[in-house]
Amino acid sequence: MKKTIQVAKRALKYNDVPIGAIVVMDGKIIASGYNRKKVTKNPMDHAEIIALKRAARKIGDWRLNNCVLYSTLEPCIMCAGAILHYRIKRVVFGTVEPKFGGVVSNDRIFDIKTLNHSVDYEFGVFEEEIKGMMRDFFKKVRGKVF
């Protein structure tokens, strides 16, 4: 998760929300991504989406069955759907996202039993450090706390 936090901080250079994601296969990082919405002017360029695309390109297959995705923040509903489509087996994230989170905060996408793929998940890893990073960012950018 420490590496994911480092990746998230790259977004700060572009004044974007500091969210980072890495994809790990067989204990090795194969891809990473950070929020790039401000740079690309594309609201779908979330850290998780970028990391998933890069991982698929790296291994030459969209099926990331043996991979774990680490993210600083709870994946949103869109990213949770992408994680299912890429067949990620496990997701670990630092802290919840009460407004748009799609894993535990709102729609709980991974808990839908009728889907053809299931994802194990864990959260709360480095939670206070990540909350502090998010709080500092939003206080600076919007004058209010996340």
Q: What spans do the regions from the language model cover?
A:
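Short beta->alpha transition motifs characteristic of CBS
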Residues: 30-37
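Short beta-strand scaffold segments in enzyme catalytic cores
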Residues: 19-27
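Helix-adjacent hinge/juxtasegments
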Residues: 41-45, 49-84
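Zinc-dependent deaminase
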Residues: 1-14, 75-146
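Residues that line or immediately flank small-molecule/substrate-binding pockets and catalytic motifs
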Residues: 37, 71, 95
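Short secondary-structure boundary/capping segments
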Residues: 21, 60-61, 111-113
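Small-residue (primarily alanine) positions within well-ordered alpha-helices
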Residues: 4, 8-11, 21, 31, ...
